[in-house]
Design a protein with these regions (language model features):
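Non-catalytic, well-ordered alpha-helical scaffold segments
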Residues: 11, 15, 33, 91, ...
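Amphipathic alpha-helical "lid/sensor" segments that cap RecA-like P-loop NTPase cores
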Residues: 75-137
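C-terminal leucine-rich, beta-strand-based interaction scaffolds used for sensing/assembly
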Residues: 138-139, 146-219
């Protein structure tokens, strides 16, 4: 998962892949990630300074399923596990995870083990929270202030601030001071590059729920 390769580890992994690409035969690396922008940023194959510059790769994009496709996906999965699950449960899972294949796979496996829808949701939110906190930790290496502002912007958008003005107002209210447009622009742009948000909306409903739980920090 590309989300786990933020920070110094990313360069080590890219160096290892580049070495294997040059010297090893019949070896394939598969990198996955729900944050498409982060995956592209990690590979960075168009940057001459990247260890993977110029290396061939093939990209497979798996889009969201429709509600019907999600339900059929879950039914087949439960059938393979020889588990009987009611249509109401299948519909609930399909609607909650909004057709995202990775979450549907996780949800099906967790429900098969626990038979508890609330546990399914909590497990997914905890995973999303862990990935968001990892992003914040990376930002904290640059500046605790920057990290705090990322948290605030994510929480503001998760709680309904769906325009530039509303996000800026929410950020300034929490900071207790005026924030320059360039600061917010950089944060929004980076979150969009990571495929976390677009047009002040979360692309992934689970990330939205996780971001609502981000804690406020005292100044």
């Amino acid at each position: 998962e590309a989300q786990r390769l933020r920070g110094p580890l990313a360069n080590e992994v890219k160096d290892a892949i580049a070495h294997a690409y040059d010297y090893d035969r019949n070896l394939t690396f598969i990198l996955t990630g729900s944050e498409v922008g982060l995956l592209h940023e990690l590979l960075n194959v168009d940057n001459e300074e990247s260890p993977l510059y110029g290396r061939y790769y093939h990209e497979v994009t798996l889009g969201r399923f429709s509600v019907n496709e999600s339900e059929e996906f879950l039914r087949r999965g439960f059938s393979e596990l020889s588990i009987s699950v009611g249509d109401d449960v299948i519909t609930s899972i399909a609607e909650y995870f909004d057709g995202i294949p990775g979450w549907l796979t996780l949800a099906g496996n967790v429900y098969a083990r626990t038979r508890d829808l609330s546990q399914v949701r909590e497990t997914a939110i905890k995973i999303a929270m862990s990935e968001i906190e990892n992003l914040i930790r990376v930002k904290e290496r640059t500046s605790p202030i920057v990290a705090r502002r990322y948290e605030t912007v994510l929480r503001c958008i998760a709680n309904g601030s769906n325009s530039w003005g509303r996000v800026l107002r929410c950020l300034e209210d929490e900071e207790g001071s005026t924030i320059s447009s360039s600061v917010l622009h950089n944060i929004i742009t980076n979150l969009e590059k990571l495929s976390i948000i677009k047009d002040y909306e979360f692309l992934d409903p689970i990330y939205r729920e996780a971001s609502k739980r981000l804690k406020r920090h005292s100044q």
